[in-house]
Amino acid sequence: MDAATARKILVQHEPADLYETVQPILKNGKLRAELVEGSFAKNETFRYNCVRVLFRAMNLRPNSFYPYWDRFAEGIDSPNGFHRSVGAQAIAYLASVDKDTRLDSIFDHYLKLIDDSKVMVSHYFLDTLPLIYRARPDFQPKIVTCLLSLDKTRHPPSRKEMLKADIISNLDQIFNTLSSKDKKKVISFIKDQLQSGSPKTRKTAKEFGKKHGLW
């Protein structure tokens, strides 16, 4: 696929061949730059397509997008919730190739996205946080503390209950790597969610317990 065809696909509504643009983008620096900027575009269709392709491409070759670190880091402070979501997820994908340890200077600020004014932003932040957990063992204690701090956020109670399903999914991915002390904290958190007001969270907590032999 040539660059012109890839560009045409990215502006289409729900194109069936969207992910066929990934390889051309990985091979073409100009297309990559356009994709990154497109992920912050005003046009919803174009932005949505760019974001989907961006994360597929970053998963395959994150190093190709490391030069755009600053653009993504700026995104987490954008007044636009969609931009904050993109920035949060992109930084997580780049953590494994962060040779200049740029994450260090913004990490505490980054973790505050769990308390974002938009629940959507917190959801996507949580969705990719395990990528940082695996890439940066030195940040693991802070990540666990962050995951267990949701009740301290400003989210309305109903939204907190929804987000706890995301947190349980995170904890499921990292549970076997936790210290005994942190496992006890997590188990206590999971047991509390069996009484959650969210059916999804209750179900997720129950499945977590069965998987990890808690009951």
Show the residue positions of the predicted features.
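Extended alpha-helical scaffolding segments
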Residues: 132, 149-204, 208
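Amphipathic alpha-helical scaffolding segments comprising HEAT/armadillo-like alpha-solenoid repeats
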Residues: 2-4, 26-39, 62-75, 100-113, ...
